[in-house]
């Protein structure tokens, strides 16, 4: 994971995808990889933390509402660990209050499902500074 981008010779970071819904993970993975980026899937925030790959992540796309640790709890945990990964939250139910909290805590974007795939890719590229 994390190999070298042949064209630029730079070490590439991967996009971490976190959602408990396999079909969403499949779609996001296909989208990210079709854009020439490397994606890695995680079924929960806990699974992501278990792998301890923070330094290799270029951007994180996470569902706000997941069983176990929520996206907001993950954001707080990463902040505690002084890990400044750009986070894009996705949700089908998030309230305005949740959005404000996520953005106030440093999220790059907060997108509602069904996702505007072009906007998501543009947001990922901006987060990566590509």
Regions found by a protein language model. Name each.
Residues 73, 94-109:
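Alpha4 helix (beta4-alpha4-beta5 surface) of REC/receiver domains from two-component response regulators
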Residues 63, 91:
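Active-site residues of response regulator receiver
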């Amino acid at each position: 994971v994390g190999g070298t981008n042949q064209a630029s010779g730079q070490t590439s970071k991967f996009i971490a995808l976190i959602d408990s819904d396999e079909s969403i993970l499949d779609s996001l993975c296909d989208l990210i990889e079709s854009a020439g980026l490397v994606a890695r899937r995680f079924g929960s925030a806990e699974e992501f933390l278990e792998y301890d790959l923070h330094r290799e992540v270029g951007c994180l796309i996470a569902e706000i509402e997941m069983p176990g640790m929520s996206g907001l709890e993950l954001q707080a945990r990463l902040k505690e660990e002084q890990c400044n990964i750009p986070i894009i939250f996705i949700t089908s139910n998030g309230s305005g209050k949740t959005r404000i909290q996520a953005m106030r805590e440093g999220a790059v974007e907060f997108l509602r499902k069904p996702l505007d795939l072009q906007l998501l890719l543009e947001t990922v590229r901006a987060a990566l500074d590509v």
